[in-house]
Regions:
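Long, hydrophobic alpha-helical segments that serve as membrane-spanning/inserting helices
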Residues: 1-16, 30, 37-211
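Hydrophobic membrane-insertion alpha-helices, especially the h-region
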Residues: 19-33
Length: 211
C-alpha cells in the first residue's frame, strides 16, 4: 500500500507526501536494526561468558545452558529498498535537496549492503561450515518445561571435561565474538545515519509545507 502511494506521489511530484511515506519505510528498517542489535548484544555476552568460563577452566554450571544454546545465534535485518528503487526508476535527479539525495543513496547502496554482505553473510557462512557441525557434536539441545515459543534455546555439553580442552570450540567462540562485535558496530553506524536522514527529511518536509 505504501509503495503504491509512493509511486503515485512520484508521478505527481508531491514531495511532501513522498517524504512522509519514505519515512514510514525507513523508520521500519531503523527499528529492525535496533531490535537485531539488542538480540546480538545478548548473544555476544553469552559467547564471551562461555569463552571466559572455559579459559578459566571453571566447573560446569547449569546456568550456562542458555548460553550454550544461543551463543552461535545471529539476527538478520530485513532491508526494504523498494521505495528507493521506485525513486531511482523515476529519476533521483527529481530530488532538489542534494544533501538528502547523497545520504539516501549512501545508506541504501553502501550501508545496507555492508550489513547484509560483510556482516550477515560472514555469520551464515561460519554457522554452516564450522559452528553448527561442532555444536551438534559437542552439545545436546533441550527445552525446559517452562520454555515458551520464541524464547532462547538451551543446550548441555555432551562432555564438559572434553570441552575445557577443545581449542577448536574456543577459537570458534573467539571468531563469533569478533564478527558479532563488528556486526553490531556496523548496524549502530547504519542506525545513526538513518536517524540523521530522518531528521533531514523532517526539516525538508517542514520547509515544503512552509512554501
Amino acid at each position: 500500500m505504501i509503495l503504491r502511494r509512493i509511486t503515485e506521489h512520484v508521478k505527481a511530484q508531491n514531495w511532501t507526501a513522498i517524504w512522509i511515506q519514505f519515512v514510514l519505510l525507513v523508520s521500519g528498517v531503523f527499528l529492525g536494526i535496533q531490535v537485531a542489535n539488542w538480540k546480538d548484544e545478548r548473544w555476544l555476552a553469552c559467547s564471551r561468558r562461555i569463552l571466559d568460563h572455559l579459559d578459566a577452566r571453571e566447573p560446569y554450571s547449569e546456568d550456562l545452558d542458555i548460553c550454550f544454546g544461543t551463543c552461535f545465534w545471529s539476527s538478520k535485518v530485513q532491508f526494504s529498498t523498494t521505495a528507493y528503487e521506485q525513486l531511482k526508476n523515476r529519476g533521483l535527479d527529481l530530488i532538489s535537496n542534494k544533501a538528502l539525495l547523497t545520504e539516501i543513496s549512501r545508506i541504501h547502496e553502501y550501508m545496507f549492503e555492508l550489513v547484509a554482505t560483510e556482516n550477515e553473510q560472514w555469520d551464515w557462512q561460519l554457522l554452516g561450515s564450522s559452528v553448527y557441525p561442532r555444536h551438534v557434536e559437542r552439545f545436546r539441545k533441550y527445552f525446559p518445561d517452562s520454555w515458551m515459543p520464541l524464547e532462547d534455546e538451551y543446550a548441555k555439553p555432551v562432555d564438559y571435561h572434553a570441552l575445557l580442552g577443545d581449542t577448536t570450540v574456543k577459537n570458534i567462540l573467539a571468531e563469533i565474538i569478533s564478527l558479532k562485535g563488528f556486526s553490531i558496530a556496523t548496524k549502530k553506524a547504519t542506525a545513526l545515519e538513518i536517524d540523521a536522514l530522518l531528521s533531514g527529511i523532517d526539516r525538508e518536509v517542514s520547509e515544503l509545507r512552509g512554501r
